[in-house]
């Protein structure tokens, strides 16, 4: 009888996912831990590895189809495979496993006494058999470092954790990185015969585009948007960045204007805390957030992603610059984790990098505000009674009018302008 592999719970509270790509087909011979498919949820693309070795008999769910946790997605001829219980799917096998707990109590190992704090939000890559093994040993699998392919946790890693040691990183990481690059290379489009005066072609909506569309529609339908547009002379900011650009480069930091904007926004969120909340109309609650995490909208080949700079209020301009650059590289390479894209309290969208100026950015719901920054352009301004040319930055602030009144929004915008106009004040207040 073929082993029926069901879509496992891939975490983040997501109960379904779209099969983006299959890496196997009927007749393929696979080994345990080989990647079967890529699954897209609302937050990221996740690789689904095989828990068994064997031969693929049948792929049950086509690419582009949404599967629910517990659905059979592929059948594998794996004679030696035991029935496995997957998180998110209950069947009679669970009752069969209960007596096994009493068979060999002597094998129960004491819970490891490591004192490090465990990140309960960490995304874990591990086979169901390894998860079960960790539970039997009394180990919190989120505390274990993975040495397998793509950081996957193995039984040896669990044993090493129990012994108080750290696993050695696998040499497969370099090879896996190469494989990922190959896997992410888009396939050449199929030849299409275009006829008539108005030729058209169709394609399935990609998983990432579908997730983006869902988020945009939800935000616009839920939050009444108001957008304020303004501009500010940033000559002093321009000079400040120029002064410290070489110093930053000496320590490997690429200094841009964006970290300054992050610090200015954080200062505004602290001064006007209504912008750092969520409005839960169904529960009749306003959630006040006493942390300042800034999302940075990033344009990638896959679509719009929003990595998050956590605790931006605690970081320097240089630190924020480094983190933004690192997250941008991960976004372009498709290697952002779900944890790196959650937890934002307010977001920045930089249309200026594409040459844009003012626009109406869509709030990243359930946040209540988003700051849009446009290009810096030389414009005539009046300074000390004279018309002079100066670099001017375009700003657009969208906010949820259910929570934020117009005057509050404009006051926040004025505060941001004041800080960007005078970077020394920004450093004092930020």
From Swiss-Prot:
- Quote the catalytic activity from the record: N(6)-[(R)-dihydrolipoyl]-L-lysyl-[protein] + acetyl-CoA = N(6)-[(R)-S(8)-acetyldihydrolipoyl]-L-lysyl-[protein] + CoA
Modification N6-lipoyllysine, positions? 43
Q: Which UniProt keywords apply?
A: Acyltransferase, Lipoyl, Transferase
Query: Quick one: where's region Disordered?
Result: 80-122, 165-199
Enumerate the spans annotated as Peripheral subunit-binding (PSBD) domain: 125-162
One Pfam family of this protein, by short name?
Biotin_lipoyl
- Which family does the similarity line name? Belongs to the 2-oxoacid dehydrogenase family.
Q: How does it assemble?
A: Forms a 24-polypeptide structural core with octahedral symmetry.
This protein is called what?
A: Dihydrolipoyllysine-residue acetyltransferase component of pyruvate dehydrogenase complex
Tell me the organism.
Staphylococcus aureus (strain MRSA252)
């Amino acid at each position: 009888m073929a082993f029926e592999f069901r879509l496992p719970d891939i975490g983040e509270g997501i109960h379904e996912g779209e099969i983006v790509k299959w890496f196997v087909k009927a007749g393929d011979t696979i080994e345990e831990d080989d990647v079967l498919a890529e699954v897209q949820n609302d937050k990221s693309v996740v690789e689904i590895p095989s828990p068994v070795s064997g031969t693929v008999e049948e792929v049950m769910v086509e690419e582009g189809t949404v599967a629910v946790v517990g659905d059979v997605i592929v059948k594998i001829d794996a004679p030696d495979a035991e029935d496995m219980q997957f998180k998110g799917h209950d069947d009679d096998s669970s009752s069969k496993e209960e007596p096994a707990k009493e068979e060999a109590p002597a094998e129960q190992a004491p819970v490891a006494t490591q004192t490090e704090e465990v990140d309960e939000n960490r995304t874990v890559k591990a086979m169901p058999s390894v998860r079960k093994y960790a539970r039997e040993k009394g180990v919190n699998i989120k505390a274990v470092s993975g040495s397998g392919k793509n950081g996957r946790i193995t039984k040896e890693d669990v044993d090493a954790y129990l012994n108080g040691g750290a696993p050695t990183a696998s040499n497969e990481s370099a090879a896996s990185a190469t494989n990922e690059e190959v896997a992410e290379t888009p396939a050449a489009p199929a030849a299409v015969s275009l006829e008539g005066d108005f030729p058209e072609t169709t394609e399935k909506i990609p998983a990432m585009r579908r997730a983006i569309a869902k988020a945009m529609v939800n935000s616009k339908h839920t939050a009444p948007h108001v957008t304020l547009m303004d501009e500010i002379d940033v000559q002093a900011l321009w000079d400040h960045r120029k002064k410290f650009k070489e110093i930053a480069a000496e320590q490997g930091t690429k200094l841009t204007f964006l970290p300054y904007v992050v610090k200015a926004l954080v200062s505004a969120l602290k001064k006007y805390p209504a912008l750092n909340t969520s409005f839960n109309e169904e529960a009749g609650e306003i959630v006040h957030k006493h942390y300042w995490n800034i999302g940075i909208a990033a344009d990638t080949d896959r679509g719009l992603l929003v990595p998050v700079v956590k605790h931006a209020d605690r970081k320097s301009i240089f630190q924020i610059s480094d983190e933004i650059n690192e997250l941008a590289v991960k976004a372009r390479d498709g290697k952002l984790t779900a944890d790196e894209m959650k937890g934002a309290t307010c977001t920045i969208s930089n249309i200026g990098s594409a040459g844009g100026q003012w626009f109406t950015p869509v709030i990243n719901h359930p946040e209540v505000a988003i700051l849009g920054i446009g290009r810096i352009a030389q414009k005539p301004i009046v300074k000390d009674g004279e018309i002079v040319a100066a670099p001017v930055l375009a700003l657009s602030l969208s906010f949820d009018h259910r929570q934020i009144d117009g005057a509050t929004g404009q006051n926040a915008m004025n505060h941001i302008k004041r800080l960007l106009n005078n970077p020394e004040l920004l450093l004092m207040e930020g």
